[in-house]
Each structure stands twice: as structure tokens, then as C-alpha cells.
């Protein structure tokens, strides 16, 4: 049956149609059978690209275009070996890109599985939490505020239920839902008007409901739309975009240098075909072939590593932003605290008692009524080892059981027939129950629980010795004093009240029943994390809905705030204009009793102050501030809406995990920065070695095949090793956060690139000229006159054997010096003797492979023929190794001078 018909059927007709039960749901066996028959409740994955499509995508790069042009020109000039090598390199580069992107894609797909939403389903009359993907048609689903609707559902029960359906209708105003609504059978009604239906991917913003699943997966309304949508472009990170722009710039510069050199050759009356080959070589030298692959694999591996420390990254750009975070705004409950609430104190009509001393003292009418209210006005459930619901409500159930009162029994005695769910504006929750009498029901009673300062405002009476008596001003003052006392002890407070009100009468004129104080101990590791943040230049700010005294007590214990003046309440915040708030914001460390709108204001105020803000949250009302923050951090136990709005999810709800994530973010950025500086300084050295030699009228020190070999073998492998290097976390977290717009070449990066580029240029030229200079010296023809010296070199390098050997020297030195250079680049602040090589086994492997292949290219006959190299003696290898080690010696000298 089409999903669009169910809004025209009453509840029983829908239940019969889907062979389900509106109270008990399906049996586990029937649910399993339907899952096997109809498949999982998931959107079909986008059609995967073919291997050919993936390969061609790798060629869509300006840097690759240069290599392809170089290959074509080489063919026209008769240099077939160079053309074959360039073509081979392009193919290998594309294949490596496909493999690495495949690895990145698999990592992200694994993360998607980790972030798949859960849902509450009722099967065989038992509420249980299952992955939304396992829902089947006919399942009875429980819907609460903050949940993402997991399938298309015909409502069977609704209580103040509102659903935001912008994902389907484009209308952002939540729609009031009504399970009893019945559409006119004679007319087709628009989706937005089907108020007895809720649809997959929409969001419950308010209230509570239950319903029968009518469609899953691609059969849902959103599934039909998804089947018509073409594949979306994959999101690129800001760093990837910047590196893409850098690639385009390098392409332009490369062509400019080639054109300049060609014009110079014409001016010098050089051989035109020969100079075309040189220009091709220069173009190749300017292309850092390994750069895109390094960045892709570095980010993907980082995301995979974060899973091991209980962090799920939902958006790749977040990895970069993490490293720049300067303020962490954290909720208190469950993040800075353990979220293991226990009732420690309770108060009823002037009796304040430790909960531990209340064991078995449920005989007092006041205690019974207060507990009855807190257990009935409660949506949590205890089912053996499975605890489902809000930690506050679970703590009340635990306390009730300790006192000999059980919610399930009370629910049978006082069945709930309506409710007003908790929301952040009212700060209360009310449920309406039938009163039992002589086997029947007489009248009704309403129980309300919420923040004591809010509840007391709605009360006119107080329960005294089992009777409801008018509340005096003195009693109101006493309640306020009890709340302050509990808050000063870092206890969360919750009050209960009762009334004879019906759902249409509001929540006024209630009778105050009592207060409980619950302790949520601070996480021991949170204090250490706050201190690490302080040393790292990252401020910690607590934002909570709790009372200011409770919040300050925890903040002081954790080292977030040292003085009461660093705290502000939502009410005080309302009285501050933007200018006053901007002046105070740097000193405020605790925000208490704040609304969702105020959270957004706090985030934006910090951002206007130049801060990069990470914000934690777990509720539906946290979604706006999570979206507003630079990094939205949702809790693993949070609602689906918060997770969808967040950039990052903490699966252990632990504040200390944020510190590990920021450390990882800083480390990833530093690794990419090291790789970029290494690759560009190496390519600059190759480019300038050739440019200077040719500008002097000499032959080219390197062939294009030599440069490609260096760039792919002795550049790309070490660059990849640098990209996955294990950083010193303690050192990283002793530095202030970088600015979000900071260039990769900031903090000495440009100087480092130019210094090592110049050094590699000198080494390359020295290696190229050492043989002809030696011959000139042996003849006694080494002249201090530059023109005579250049003329002598030019004459010697015109001889094929001398040129081949000189090019072999330059090729070998430039290839090996990249390996030495990479070892030093692991940590620009530390001596290589202070680094532990086995912390980066990939670097060890890259160096071993690099040296072995560089040796092979001058010793294996097939490779000698392909690359036009010469066999080297042991003495020559020793000399060239000394020259190649200069970048490492320079690194040690720089480190020594800094100290």
C-alpha cells in the first residue's frame, strides 16, 4: 500500500493493514522476518563510480596537465624514453590516488556507520533501543523531543507533539501533530497537512508520541526524493582548497619559468629542441606530484585515529578547525561531570534529610507524595541491566526503589492520560493521571517537576502533614534557602508539585511537595584537561542550565573559575547590551541558567572577539548553538538533532576527549604543514638547480625522467611519512592556538622553504659541477675568471660521457638529500638525535626504500638504460652521500643556534 493512503485510515485500520499491535508492537521473530524480506531501513548508496571514472578524475589537475604536455612534447622531439617514463608516472600517480582516496572513503563510510541513529521501539510490549536501520513496517516506535523521525510513521498517540518538516516541505515552523486526525478519503491532501503522519528525516521539536511504521528506506517520502537526486559533490576542506589554489599558482609559475628560460635560450642562440626538453624538465620540477595524495591520506588517517579516542568526526574540515580552537564552551552535566546522578538530600516541609538516612522511611505522607510525583512525572525506565532515559529521571527511579516505591506499579494505579513535556522555556514537565478508587477511577491529578525557583512561582500551597495548606512568604524564603544550601554543596536541585488541574487549565495554583538534591561528581580527568587547555592557550567556559551556585562549585573544583565574579546568569545576561557584554566576555567563565538563544549569543560574542569556539551539547535546544560554533561537539548519548547539527561526536561524553581531539587537530595541521614545506623546498631546489645551470649557458643537470623519479620516490614517500608522523602531544599543547586564517608558511615556514631550497640548489649544482671542475683543475685550467670558467665547463659538458656522469651525480645527490631532509623535517625544533626513529616506522621504511631504489637506478642495467645514468664506485657513493647529508647538518645547526 502507498504510504500516502495511511493518513486516510484510522488507527485500527492501519494496525490491521500492517498486521501489528498498537500496544505491544511486533514480535521479535516477525520483525526479523520482515527485515530479511524488505531489507534495512536505509537510503541506497549512490551509484559507485567505475574504475575508469575514478582514473580519469585523477587526471583533472593542472599539475597533471603539465606532465601530459611534457610527455607529448618529448614524443615530438624523439625522446621516447622520457615520454614513456612521464606517462608511466602519470598512470602510477593516478593509481596511487585511487588507492588512497579509496582508503579515505572507506574510513569515512565506517564513521557513517558509527553515527547511524538509534531509535526506541516497542516489541512484545517491551521498550528497547535499536539501530534505526533495523526498523521494519509495522514496528511501534516511541518518539520524543529531539529525536529524528526514523521512518514514515502513522501516529497512534500524540501529546503536544510538534515536528519540524523543513527537510521535506521547506517550512521551518514546527507542525502540530494529532494522532486522531483523519484525512478526507475523497481528496489527496498535501504532505504538510497530513498531521497524523510523521516522516523520515524530520525532527521532533516538542512533545511525545507513538506510531506504527508505514514505510522504510527508499519507500519513504524522503527516499523517493533521494532516488531523484544526482550525486552531491564531496566536500573539500579549506586546506585542500588552498592547496588546490597553490597547485594552480605553481602551474602558472612553472609555465612562466619555462617561457623565460626558452626566451633566454633563444637569446643565447642555444639548440631549440634541446631547450624544449630543458623547459619540459623545469615544468616537471615545479610539480609536487605527491602533495594532493599526502593531504588526502593524512586527513583520512587522522579521522580513523580519532575513533580510537572516542571521537567521531562528521565533517572533514573539522579536523583542521580543531587545531585552531581557542575557547571550549562545555555543558556541565555529563561532560565535565560523570552523569551518574544519585539523590543525596531531600527536603519536604521543613525537613532536610540525607537520602542515605531515608532508607525505608517512605511512611511519611509528604515523602510518599513527593516521590509519587517524581516517579509518575518521569519517562525513564529500568529493565534489568538496561537503563533507558534521562540520567536525572533514572536517579529518581533509583531513589524510589530504595524507598520501596516502583514506577511501574504506580503507573498501573495512576494511569497517565496526558502530559506536557519538559521544554527549556517552561523548565517544567507535567503529567496527568487518573485517581484510583474502589476499582474504578475518580477524577484526576497532575504532577509537575522542574527547577525549584520556577516551580515555586506556580505554587500557592505547600503539603504539610499530608494536607495542602496556603504557602506563606516565610515558607517561600525557606525553600529558597534550601535550594541555595544544596547548590553550594554542588547538588543539582529538582522540585515536585501537584494539582487537580486538567490539561486545559495550565500549571497554576499547585501544591509544593518537596525538593531533592542530586550529586553528579566531577570527572577526575576533566580537571587535568582544563589545566592542559590553560597551558595550550585554550580557555574553558561552562555553559549550563543549572543554578549558578551549583555551576560555580563544580567550576571552582575543576579550575575553570576562581572567583564568583566570573559567573553570570541568563537573567543578568539579558540586562547586558552587546557593548557591555563584549567588555565582560573575556572574564566570564561560567554561564548559568541560560536559554538556547543566549547560548547562541555567547558563541557569537566569543567569535566577534576573534575566538575559534568549540561548543558541546546534547539536547534539541543545543542544536542552534552547535551550528553557530566553529566546532559543534555532540554527546554520544545526545539526541539525533544535536548529532546532526554537530561537526564532531564524543562517544564517551567525556570532556577530556575534547583535549585529545584538539591535540590531534593540531598534530594533523603540523604534519600537513611539514609535508608541504618539505615538498616545496625540495622542488624549489630542483627547479633552481636547473635554472641557474641553464642560465649560465650550461647543459641541464637533470633529465625530466630524473626529476619525476626524485619527486615520486624520494619526495612523495617521505612526504607521506611526514604526514602521518607521531607528534609530541605535550609540545603541541604547550603552544597557543594558531589563527584560523594562518598561512602554511607562517611561523618561519617561508624562511624554512627558501633556506632549504637554496641549500638544495647549492648541493645539486656542486654535485653536477664537481666532475668537470675536477677535470679542469687536473689540467690546470681552472680559472677565477667567470666567463673562462663557464666556457671550460660548457665545453666539457658537451661531451656525452661527462654529461651523463655529471647528471648521474646531480640526480643521485638530489635524490638522497631529500631523504636526509625529510628526517630533519620531522621536528624543526628538535635535534635528530633526540627523535625516536621507531615512532615513525613509515619514515624508516621510506628511507630504506628510497636509498635502495636510488642505488638501483645507477647499478641495475635496465634502469641505467632507461634513465641514462652511469655506474658509481664506492668512493663516489661516499662523496655523494656526504654532499646529500648537508640538509640534515643544516637542520642540526639551526636547532643548535635556536638553543
Predicted regions and their residues:
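C-terminal substrate-binding/catalytic lobe of Rossmann-fold NAD(P)-dependent dehydrogenases
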Residues: 26, 767-770, 774, 803, ...
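Generic alpha-helical transmembrane segments
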Residues: 714, 807-822
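Membrane-interfacial helical/loop segments at transmembrane boundaries in membrane proteins
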Residues: 774-801, 862-871
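Alpha-helical transmembrane segments and their immediate juxtamembrane interface regions
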Residues: 784-804, 812, 816, 887-894
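Alpha-helical transmembrane segments and their membrane-interface junctions
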Residues: 758-774, 854-868
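Conserved cytosolic headpiece of P-type ATPases
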Residues: 1-736, 742-745, 811, 828-899
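Membrane-interface segments at transmembrane helix junctions and kinks
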Residues: 795-805, 873-882
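Membrane-water interface at loop-to-transmembrane-helix junctions
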Residues: 738-759, 796-809
